[in-house]
């Protein structure tokens, strides 16, 4: 498959924003996490050391909660100079799990979703996609 991580990141962000506005917290939170993941993968997919046979290497095919610790800050500095500061600030997705998509309503708090939204917005900006690095 020809992955378009940049397009996917922007699409997930837009859909998450809409769902958030509709008070669909759990689904919005899932998409914020996927948008963040795709933003990072959009950058990593341009780093030769992160590729295998022209695609993102299996070591980087993780969800954002696990992918965070695999981001090669030194390798992405030229492509996404702002990403280093965002990554070094700590993993804001430690409490995000893709498996939460199976959970019932109310499992994701509004404050947790807001934190993931803010982190995703910063990542999108740092990766040169829509959103901004600021607040």
Residue spans for each PLM region:
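Terminal alpha-helical segments
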Residues: 1-135
């Amino acid at each position: 498959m020809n992955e378009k991580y940049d397009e996917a990141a922007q699409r997930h962000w837009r859909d998450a924003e809409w769902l958030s506005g509709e008070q669909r917290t759990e689904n919005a939170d899932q998409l914020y996490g996927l948008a963040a993941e795709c933003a990072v993968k959009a950058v990593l997919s341009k780093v030769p050391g992160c590729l295998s046979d022209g695609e993102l290497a299996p070591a980087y095919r993780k969800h954002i909660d696990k992918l965070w610790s695999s981001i090669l800050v030194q390798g992405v500095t030229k492509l996404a100079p702002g990403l280093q500061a965002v990554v070094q600030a700590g993993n804001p997705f430690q409490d995000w799990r893709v498996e939460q998509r199976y959970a019932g309503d109310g499992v994701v708090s509004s404050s947790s979703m807001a934190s993931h939204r803010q982190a995703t917005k910063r990542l999108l900006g740092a990766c040169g996609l829509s959103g901004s690095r600021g607040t």
